[in-house]
UniProtKB/Swiss-Prot annotation:
Task performed by this protein: Catalyzes the oxidative phosphorylation of glyceraldehyde 3-phosphate (G3P) to 1,3-bisphosphoglycerate (BPG) using the cofactor NAD. The first reaction step involves the formation of a hemiacetal intermediate between G3P and a cysteine residue, and this hemiacetal intermediate is then oxidized to a thioester, with concomitant reduction of NAD to NADH. The reduced NADH is then exchanged with the second NAD, and the thioester is attacked by a nucleophilic inorganic phosphate to produce BPG.
Protein name, UniProt field: Glyceraldehyde-3-phosphate dehydrogenase
Swiss-Prot/TrEMBL catalytic activity: D-glyceraldehyde 3-phosphate + phosphate + NAD(+) = (2R)-3-phospho-glyceroyl phosphate + NADH + H(+)
Record's keyword annotation contains NAD: yes
UniProt-annotated location(s): Cytoplasm
Quaternary assembly: Homotetramer.
Organism per entry: Helicobacter pylori (strain ATCC 700392 / 26695) (Campylobacter pylori)
Binding positions (D-glyceraldehyde 3-phosphate): S150, C151, T152, T181, R197, T210, K211, R233
Involved pathway(s): Carbohydrate degradation; glycolysis; pyruvate from D-glyceraldehyde 3-phosphate: step 1/5
PANTHER family per UniProt: GLYCERALDEHYDE-3-PHOSPHATE DEHYDROGENASE 2
Length: 332
């Protein structure tokens, strides 16, 4: 399987690291190119030295438009001119979010496109599906362009799918307690859209927006107009937490809810949902590959209401789902 990565920021680099890690035990994924307009000497340095995920266990260097990782050589570019031979291009730049702009990759020769973000603009949802691996990826019908949704949607969708099937969700509210990201400011500096995101990310708790709950119906259609939420950005480099409050049609005691989630973690959602029984904190989940990690002691119920809290590495977990989805699209 031949993969091309466009955009070599936090997610692009994590995707490559995830592929390298998998290829150590099962070498089936070939990255045949990476594109980013930045300086490749610096990008090579950032791949090897990561403040969150640590030092890559192989030496990385750049030479003559090649990223050299140990004995592996990957062609790199500052612009894309040809994608012939590419099975799946994973779009990680954050620049191209409308499906029509992603069609340019098909014109350049790529067979399929996977977007590492929700789609923007108006589009045909059947032609351009939003898929969450483990929840609705089986709805894939060989479409050429797919959105992998957001890291937060990947975290809440497995939980909502299980509880809606068992208890029927009437409505819900989400708070994602989210590590700060590159769309925030290191010091107080004007943000183009959001006053609060203009404030120093590492010094403040910053309420802002999230589309994860509103977009959930694209993955679970029966939850349309039933979910809302917001984000609270916190001074943490990585790992976030969902605080999901749901009002159910049926009374939902704590133990049966936790039992359902534990059962799913061992079965249909193995590798996607994990259970934490050790009362861990955020730094313990750095580089955890699951979409969400549920802490059963943080499940609370009151009559028909339930609150569930779950951790997720918003970089590494999501990047692993991108690789899973790319492989699924290729083998379809």
């Amino acid at each position: 399987m031949k993969i091309f990565i466009n955009g070599f920021g936090r997610i692009g680099r994590c995707v490559l690291r995830a592929i390298l890690e998998r290829n150590d035990t099962n070498p089936k994924l070939e990255v045949i190119g990476i594109n980013d307009p930045a300086n490749w000497e610096i990008l090579a340095y950032l791949l090897e030295h990561d403040s969150v995920h640590g030092l890559l266990p192989k030496e990385v260097r750049y030479s003559n438009y090649k990223l050299i990782i140990g004995s592996l050589e990957i062609p790199v570019f500052n612009s894309i001119k040809d994608l012939k031979g590419v099975d799946v291009i994973i779009e990680c730049s954050g620049k191209f979010l409308e499906p029509k702009t992603l069609e340019n990759y098909l014109l350049l020769g790529a067979k399929k496109v996977l977007l590492s973000a929700p789609f923007m603009g108006e589009y045909d949802e059947k032609q351009y599906p939003t898929l969450v691996y483990g929840v609705n990826h089986f709805c894939y019908q060989n479409q050429a362009i797919v959105s992998n949704a957001s890291c937060t949607t990947n975290a809440i969708a497995p939980i909502c799918a299980i509880l809606d099937k068992a208890f029927k969700i009437k409505e819900g509210m989400l708070t994602t307690i989210h590590s700060y990201t590159s769309d925030q400011k290191l010091i107080d500096l004007a943000h183009p859209l959001d006053k609060r995101r203009s404030r120093a990310a590492a010094s403040n708790i910053i309420p802002t927006t999230t589309k994860a709950a509103l977009a959930l119906h694209k993955v679970l259609p029966n939850l349309k107009n039933k979910m809302h939420g917001h984000s609270v950005r916190v001074p943490s480099l990585d790992v976030s937490m969902i605080d999901l409050s749901l009002f159910l049609e049926k009374k939902a005691p704590k133990d049966p809810i936790n039992d359902l989630l534990i059962e799913a973690s061992k079965g249909v959602l193995k590798g996607v949902l994990e259970i934490d029984l050790k009362e861990r904190v955020s730094s313990d989940f750095i580089s955890n590959p699951h979409s969400v990690i549920i802490a059963p002691d943080l499940t609370f119920t009151l009559e028909n209401m339930v609150k569930i809290m779950g951790w997720y590495d918003n970089e590494w977990g999501y990047s692993n789902r991108l690789v899973d989805m790319a492989q699924f699209m290729y083998h379809y």
